[in-house]
């Protein structure tokens, strides 16, 4: 059973994200240190690790880079568990009031994001140049295509591609980006979902947007202003000296300097085992952004989206203003607590606005824009989403009566978990090393333990052999779990169409939730209705 993080500073000196622990469990609630810190202690706490490895201690365990994702450990005091969903009884909205018809399989979870239809209100990504995205891309792309979802290729893919070709500083070919687009389209039905290419400052300098639009015929370009896990540029680890030098020559910030002879010697001697590659941070301006969006559309972008992080409220308002002026199709806000391939752990825990707080601020801005008759782009929330209850709550909270502002959620870590777990268990099955309890419950071959396999075999016939088990896993997670789970919640709420759920379908379970969102506590809900009904 997992241990819940204390709502004080007791967790500061021992975090699973950095692989650190303390000698005793009853640590100081002020500092996280052991009440008695002794000399003869072999345990590696945060202070200890920092004294040996310095900046490495800022990040999730370096040895796990490429084979893991990370998220915040801190309890922010308000999350989606602070709300419950109202159950209905006397009506059936969005469907015929017939008990033979109003059953949960008939619920529609379809929606549109920026004009793009999707089967479930989920986008996956953004999966950029970090190794965990590259290594798991086949399952991520094909699984999203099978699910009718949108998948987003993240930042720096072309810049990190050793086989990329450039002319006058602009990319003219990228084997890796082409691979990513082609894998999605292999099983894309051409109707539901799509693939987007995200671009940051480095990507724009390299002309990744033009290449993706003109050569790969991508329909969606996403500009990136930030993410919830960090408020600085994208980061990856590079374990090869020659590659680190290549990236520096391509204009990236590489730390330490791979061309420094002293650094090279230390690397060869094993003093450190990886370099850090960092991206620059953009400083957006309203006029430049509006012109940029117009330029992208002239280049052939059918849909333009913007992803930003969990910046201060005034920055949220300014972002909403610019997105409105530029008529951006969809705008993503990524709350603190979300996932990463590599972000500073202290920044994940201690910086930026947590998701529920952030959505409340975003919705305030959306209401102001709408009241003024201004354009409001479709909104997507991100930051720690893993199941259908959170999705329901995020969408319902955004509907003040004229339809939800939030059309879908963006999920990053959980799709990777689904794909990684499938890859690992496929390997264990091939080696005959599956855990006995798992094999006894679900079977010893992928054909048996992936419950959606028969359905996909029936649908795709001979082509099923081309679907990796990792793709089957993501489809199962997004469609058979989240999709069906969402249908059940909607039916229990007595609404058979996603756009019908609203704020009245939620209740706050804590004073802070009620104060932040304006959603009342259970005993305060529908008080007037009670009086009226019993009159």
What are these regions (language model features)?
Residues 126, 131-323:
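Active-site-facing alpha/beta catalytic cores
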Residues 124, 144, 331, 394, ...:
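Conserved, mostly hydrophobic/aromatic
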Residues 39, 145, 149, 294, ...:
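Generic secondary-structure signature for well-ordered alpha-helical cores
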Residues 267-458:
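Glycine-rich phosphate/ribose-binding loops and adjacent secondary-structure elements
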Residues 109-110, 163-194, 198-202, 428-466:
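A structural-propensity feature for long, helix-poor, extended segments
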Residues 1-120, 132-136, 142-145, 150, ...:
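Conserved, well-structured core domains of diverse proteins
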Residues 154, 303-307, 372-374, 493-503:
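Flexible, glycine/charged-enriched surface loops at secondary-structure junctions
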Residues 415-535:
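Short histidine
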């Amino acid at each position: 059973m997992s241990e819940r993080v204390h709502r004080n500073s007791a967790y500061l000196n021992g975090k699973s994200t950095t692989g650190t622990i303390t000698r005793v469990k009853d640590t100081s609630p002020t500092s996280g240190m052991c009440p008695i810190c002794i000399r003869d202690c072999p345990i590696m706490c945060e202070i200890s690790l920092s004294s040996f490895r310095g900046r490495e201690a800022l990040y999730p365990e370096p040895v796990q880079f490429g084979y893991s994702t990370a998220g915040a450990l801190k309890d922010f005091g308000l999350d989606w568990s602070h709300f419950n969903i109202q159950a209905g009884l006397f009506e059936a909205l969005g469907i015929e009031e017939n008990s033979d018809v109003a059953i949960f399989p008939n619920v529609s979870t379809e929606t549109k994001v920026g004009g793009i239809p999707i089967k479930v209100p989920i986008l996956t990504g953004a999966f950029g140049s970090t190794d965990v995205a590259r290594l798991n891309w086949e399952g991520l792309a094909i699984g999203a295509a099978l699910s009718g979802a949108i998948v987003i290729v993240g930042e720096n893919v072309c810049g990190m591609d050793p086989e990329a070709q450039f002319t006058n500083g602009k990319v003219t070919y990228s084997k890796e980006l082409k691979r990513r687009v082609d894998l999605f389209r292999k099983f894309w039905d051409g109707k539901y979902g799509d693939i987007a290419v995200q671009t940051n400052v480095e990507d724009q300098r390299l002309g990744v947007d033009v290449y993706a639009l003109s050569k790969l015929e991508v329909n969606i370009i996403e500009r990136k202003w930030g993410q919830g896990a960090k408020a600085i540029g994208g980061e990856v680890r590079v374990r090869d000296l020659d590659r680190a030098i290549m990236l520096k020559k391509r204009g990236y910030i590489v730390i330490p300097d791979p061309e420094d002879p002293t650094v090279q010697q230390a690397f060869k001697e094993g003093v450190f085992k990886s370099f850090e590659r960092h991206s620059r941070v953009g400083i957006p301006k309203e006029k430049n952004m509006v012109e940029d969006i117009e330029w992208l559309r002239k280049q052939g972008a059918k849909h333009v989206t913007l992803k930003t992080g969990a910046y201060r409220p005034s920055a949220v308002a300014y972002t909403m203003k610019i997105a409105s002026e530029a008529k951006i199709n969809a705008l993503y806000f990524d709350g603190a607590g979300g996932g990463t391939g590599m972000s500073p752990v202290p920044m994940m825990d201690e910086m930026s606005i947590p998701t529920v707080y952030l959505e409340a601020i975003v919705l305030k801005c959306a209401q102001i824009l709408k009241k003024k008759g201004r354009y409001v782009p479709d909104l997507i929330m991100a930051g720690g989403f893993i199941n259908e209850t959170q999705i329901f709550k995020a969408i319902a909270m955004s509907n003040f009566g004229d339809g939800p502002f939030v059309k879908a959620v963006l999920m990053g870590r959980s799709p990777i978990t689904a794909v990684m777990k499938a890859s690992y268990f496929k390997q264990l099955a091939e080696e005959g090393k599956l855990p006995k309890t798992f094999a006894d419950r679900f079977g010893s071959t992928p054909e048996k333990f992936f419950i959606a396999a028969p359905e996909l075999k029936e649908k795709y016939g001979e082509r099923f052999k081309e679907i990796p088990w990792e793709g089957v896993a993501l489809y199962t997670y997004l469609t058979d779990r989240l999709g069906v789970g969402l249908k059940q919640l909607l039916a229990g709420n007595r609404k058979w169409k996603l756009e019908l759920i609203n704020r009245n379908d939620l209740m706050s379970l804590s004073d802070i939730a009620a104060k932040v969102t304006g959603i009342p506590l259970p005993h305060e809900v529908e008080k007037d209705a009670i009086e009226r009904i019993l009159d």
